[in-house]
């Protein structure tokens, strides 16, 4: 279910502070906040989003505005479907 428009977007306060401080920096901002929404202020900033094991660098562009950070750092690794174990035929 989508968030109500009257409530506005949710962004962790500490993440907003870090984005404002690192305006021209190339160093990625490390965050565990996958639930934060991407704002227009974050465009052009590299944010390292935690996926449960390590931080995945995400370069934010204009198409990502309105989505959440967790959408761009997948948590599961897909190994492929069953398939044939005899690959010699």
UniProtKB/Swiss-Prot annotation:
GO terms for molecular function: rRNA binding; structural constituent of ribosome. Belongs to the universal ribosomal protein uS19 family. One of its GO terms (biological process) is ribosomal small subunit assembly. This is Small ribosomal subunit protein uS19. GO terms for cellular component: cytoplasm; small ribosomal subunit. Gene3D superfamilies: 30s Ribosomal Protein S19, Chain A (3.30.860.10). NCBIfam families: rpsS_bact. InterPro entries: Ribosomal_uS19, Ribosomal_uS19_bac-type, Ribosomal_uS19_CS, Ribosomal_uS19_SF. Keywords: Ribonucleoprotein, Ribosomal protein, RNA-binding, rRNA-binding. Protein S19 forms a complex with S13 that binds strongly to the 16S ribosomal RNA. It holds the Pfam family Ribosomal_S19. Disulfide bonds: none annotated.
């Amino acid at each position: 279910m989508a968030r109500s428009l009257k409530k506005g977007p949710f962004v962790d306060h500490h993440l907003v502070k870090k984005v404002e401080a690192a305006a021209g920096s190339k160093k990625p901002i490390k965050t565990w906040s996958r639930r934060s929404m991407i704002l227009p202020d974050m465009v052009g900033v590299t944010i390292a989003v935690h996926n449960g094991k390590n931080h995945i660098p995400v370069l934010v562009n204009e198409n990502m505005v309105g989505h959440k950070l967790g959408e761009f750092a997948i948590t599961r690794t897909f190994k492929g479907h069953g398939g044939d174990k005899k690959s010699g035929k």
